[in-house]
UniProtKB/Swiss-Prot annotation:
Its EC number is 2.5.1.19. Its main location: cytoplasm. Phosphoenolpyruvate binds at K20, R115, Q159, R324, R365, K391. It comes from Thermoplasma acidophilum (strain ATCC 25905 / DSM 1728 / JCM 9062 / NBRC 15155 / AMRC-C165). One of its GO terms (cellular component) is cytoplasm. One of its GO terms (biological process) is amino acid biosynthetic process. Monomer. This is 3-phosphoshikimate 1-carboxyvinyltransferase. It is an enzyme of class 2 (transferase). Belongs to the EPSP synthase family.
């Protein structure tokens, strides 16, 4: 489906989705570790639906009521699972399946099969988990001979490290060495989830996992900072909108909470309400190694700012849901921005603003970024593939309609 966006204006409080980084970990951890829980304040994103399907195939009884998910576990190894396009569910499930001794066939979306897996495969195989690449490009798992050894894990993706933390938790505890750990903030999300599920995780160069014996049976899932970024950017760029957020349940564990530091001069906090104040006075810098999900929305600032945006270590963006490096360059150029590339970092600043016409991306974060840029530009812009935002933010366009003219395009 295609939506048409024209201009910005309006005020309101953005209803943010729950953090799928937390939700997927809670769902998968609950069923594989046999910890029955109730998750509150949950928005069912596309990725969450994938994790729930895996949980049900592994014997969980799932009851959903409004914004709560009740998970009652009775673990059994699934004969097959479907991971869709969710890298988090795929990678974490692979570790848990191997640790649990399962023999499981894995299917998923072809685009996910293209993403890197070698460091995780090597770590699991070092523990005698047998992995075989199937005809769909996914790894089938045979954990019937899996062991608990002290191994080394390449932390080029935090999901590889998180998968192995879950692996050792399922084994009753253990430790392993990590080298080259990037995006450590997401590993701390895993630490928090496992603490709530009854495990102590100590994160140093060597990561140690031990059971605590006590876990929470009811857990409140916090809203998502990476989703907040899109409306924060719109509020920064447009004086015609008054954007607010309710931050009552938001901690600083999520790595994308760095937004509160990056834009501290543009944020007013009154009790549980965060209000965005417009205006960009300096160059904005974001590191793709640490905050890859912030790069698409932050890049929109560069389109309209004379100070510009710097995206460091952009190579990380080439292996996300799409090649976001190419997507960001395309989007910025279509709006007339000046884009410079030094081979490692990307620089975007305002040029002669122009009408981009129709923008078409398949990556959920690129679609939402393009929509925000369209609203800030004042042009009438068509955005294709709007349904794909359900992967992380099902209500995005409904929320955007509080601050921009949004309509279905014929």
């Amino acid at each position: 489906m295609t939506v048409k966006i024209y201009g910005s204006g309006g005020s309101g409080t953005v209803a943010l989705p729950s953090s799928k980084s937390f939700t997927q970990r809670y769902i998968l951890g609950s069923v594989f570790l046999n910890k029955s829980v109730t998750l509150n304040y949950v928005t069912i994103t596309g990725d969450d639906s994938i994790a729930l399907d895996i949980a049900q195939r592994a014997g969980a009884n799932i009851t959903m009521n409004d914004s709560s998910i009740k998970i009652r576990t009775s673990f059994t190894c699934p004969s097959d699972i479907y991971v869709g396009e969710s890298a988090t569910s795929y990678r974490i499930a692979l570790g848990l399946l191997g640790s649990a001794g399962c023999i499981t066939h894995v299917k998923g979306d072809p685009d996910l099969a293209k993403r890197p897996m070698d460091p995780l495969v090597k770590a699991l195989e070092a523990n005698d988990v047998h992995l075989k690449l199937n005809e769909d490009g996914f790894y089938d798992v045979d954990g019937s001979e899996s062991k608990k050894r002290y191994i080394e894990v390449d932390g080029v993706s935090s999901q590889f490290v998180s998968s192995m933390i879950f692996y050792y938790a399922r084994k009753g505890g253990g430790e392993f060495l990590v080298k080259n750990m990037r995006s450590p903030g997401y590993v701390y999300i895993t630490k928090r989830v496992l603490y709530d599920l009854g495990y102590f995780v100590n994160i140093e160069k060597t990561i140690t996992i031990n059971p605590s014996g006590v876990w929470k049976t009811a857990i409140d899932v916090e809203p998502d900072y990476s989703s907040l970024a899109f409306f924060l950017v719109l509020g920064l760029l447009s004086e015609n909108v008054d954007v607010r957020f309710n931050i009552k349940r938001m901690s600083r564990i999520q790595p994308d909470s760095v937004l509160l530091d990056m834009f501290k001069d543009n944020i007013a906090i009154d009790r549980d309400t965060l209000r965005v104040l417009p205006g960009i006075r300096d160059r904005i810098t974001v590191d793709a190694d640490h905050n890859p999900d912030l790069c698409p929305p932050i890049s929109v600032i560069g389109i309209f700012s004379e100070h510009g945006v710097e995206i460091d270590n952009y190579a990380r963006l080439k292996t996300k849901e799409s090649n976001r490096y190419e997507g960001i360059i395309d989007m910025a150029s279509r709006f007339g921005a000046i884009v410079e590339d030094n081979g490692k970092d990307l620089f975007i600043k305002r040029g002669d603003l122009k009408d981009p016409g129709t923008l078409s991306y398949t990556d959920h974060r690129m679609i939402m970024s393009a929509a925000v840029a369209a609203a800030a530009s004042g042009f009438e812009v068509e955005i294709e593939n709007e349904t794909k935002v359900s992967k992380s933010f099902p209500g995005f366009f409904k929320e955007l309609s509080k601050f921009a003219n949004v309509s279905e395009s014929n």
